[in-house]
Amino acid sequence: MIDEAIRSISKKYTIGGHISVAGGLHNGPARAAVFGFPTFQFFSKNQMRWSSPPLKDDEAAAFKSEVRKYGIESTMIHASYLINLASADPDLYKRSMEAFHDEIDRSDKLGSTFLTVHPGSNPDRADGIRRVRDALSTIGDHAVIILIENTAGQGNVIGTRLDEVAKIIDTSDKKLGVCIDTCHAWASGYDLRDSLEKFIESLDYTIGLDRIFAFHLNDAKREMGSRIDRHELIGKGTIDGGLINLIRDDRLRAKPKIMETPFGEARFEDNLRYMSSKIGE
């Protein structure tokens, strides 16, 4: 059993993690509650397959019941890694759109607060941004808040720079926002370690803090600007203390911060203990 003092860090700073739903979606909330998480992320289906069995009504009802039972304040579904809304390939774009719409439907059926999706890749960055914007314009009415995640800069991915992310969500749709991955931001050249305030100001200026709904809280294995997406345990990587300052920032405290660190649930307690030791609680 994890000490209540450690669990309290999760609640005070709105920290969660990516949780396995092996054995059924309804298992997620109980696993999140072990760490005192007020929020958590999960896959609603196999993230490496295009198709999946339809979500049954009783599965959705059981999940929502467990969310209420454990007092989970918000949930986040991570969309399939196969989706590429920026693709210029007609077949891939069509499959991506179908999968994206399915993710939205599943999110609404499960009552998920957020759905986070990677924008995708395209060697023509302007065309890629346009295609993602077009994709977002087709989704119609939905309850879930859709979040575009910034990327680390590998290959031809779109959304590496904050101004690209801002262009993608340049709309008045209040159910469209951004999830900032700290490892990705660091890998793409933003200094979260020694210039966090400058980074937060950049977020506010280019996107708006009101459009930043959540963070993926990850340290990084590689140096700033590496353009390599390799997550590390909190405090064991190259961002180090910058993440503690981000967690403690009053402007960001209430925003969900989801850990996607190596070994998942097996090391979440280590992450929380490190945070507690550095925060002094």
Curated annotation (Swiss-Prot):
<dbReference type="Pfam" id="PF01261">
    <property type="entry name" value="AP_endonuc_2"/>
</dbReference>
<keyword id="KW-0862">Zinc</keyword>
<feature type="binding site">
    <location>
        <position position="78"/>
    </location>
    <ligand>
        <name>Zn(2+) 1</name>
    </ligand>
</feature>
<feature type="binding site">
    <location>
        <position position="149"/>
    </location>
    <ligand>
        <name>Zn(2+) 2</name>
    </ligand>
</feature>
<keyword id="KW-0479">Metal-binding</keyword>
<feature type="binding site">
    <location>
        <position position="149"/>
    </location>
    <ligand>
        <name>Zn(2+) 1</name>
    </ligand>
</feature>
<feature type="binding site">
    <location>
        <position position="229"/>
    </location>
    <ligand>
        <name>Zn(2+) 3</name>
    </ligand>
</feature>
<dbReference type="GO" id="GO:0008081">
    <property type="term" value="F:phosphoric diester hydrolase activity"/>
</dbReference>
<comment type="similarity">
    <text>Belongs to the AP endonuclease 2 family.</text>
</comment>
<keyword id="KW-0255">Endonuclease</keyword>
<feature type="binding site">
    <location>
        <position position="184"/>
    </location>
    <ligand>
        <name>Zn(2+) 3</name>
    </ligand>
</feature>
<keyword id="KW-0378">Hydrolase</keyword>
<keyword id="KW-0540">Nuclease</keyword>
<dbReference type="InterPro" id="IPR013022">
    <property type="entry name" value="Xyl_isomerase-like_TIM-brl"/>
</dbReference>
<feature type="binding site">
    <location>
        <position position="118"/>
    </location>
    <ligand>
        <name>Zn(2+) 1</name>
    </ligand>
</feature>
<keyword id="KW-0227">DNA damage</keyword>
<dbReference type="InterPro" id="IPR036237">
    <property type="entry name" value="Xyl_isomerase-like_sf"/>
</dbReference>
<feature type="binding site">
    <location>
        <position position="216"/>
    </location>
    <ligand>
        <name>Zn(2+) 2</name>
    </ligand>
</feature>
<feature type="binding site">
    <location>
        <position position="260"/>
    </location>
    <ligand>
        <name>Zn(2+) 2</name>
    </ligand>
</feature>
<feature type="binding site">
    <location>
        <position position="181"/>
    </location>
    <ligand>
        <name>Zn(2+) 2</name>
    </ligand>
</feature>
<dbReference type="GO" id="GO:0008833">
    <property type="term" value="F:deoxyribonuclease IV (phage-T4-induced) activity"/>
</dbReference>
<dbReference type="GO" id="GO:0003677">
    <property type="term" value="F:DNA binding"/>
</dbReference>
<dbReference type="InterPro" id="IPR001719">
    <property type="entry name" value="AP_endonuc_2"/>
</dbReference>
<keyword id="KW-0234">DNA repair</keyword>
<dbReference type="GO" id="GO:0006284">
    <property type="term" value="P:base-excision repair"/>
</dbReference>
<dbReference type="InterPro" id="IPR018246">
    <property type="entry name" value="AP_endonuc_F2_Zn_BS"/>
</dbReference>
<comment type="function">
    <text>Endonuclease IV plays a role in DNA repair. It cleaves phosphodiester bonds at apurinic or apyrimidinic (AP) sites, generating a 3'-hydroxyl group and a 5'-terminal sugar phosphate.</text>
</comment>
<protein>
    <recommendedName>
        <fullName>Probable endonuclease 4</fullName>
        <ecNumber>3.1.21.2</ecNumber>
    </recommendedName>
</protein>
<dbReference type="GO" id="GO:0003906">
    <property type="term" value="F:DNA-(apurinic or apyrimidinic site) endonuclease activity"/>
</dbReference>
<dbReference type="GO" id="GO:0008270">
    <property type="term" value="F:zinc ion binding"/>
</dbReference>
<feature type="binding site">
    <location>
        <position position="231"/>
    </location>
    <ligand>
        <name>Zn(2+) 3</name>
    </ligand>
</feature>
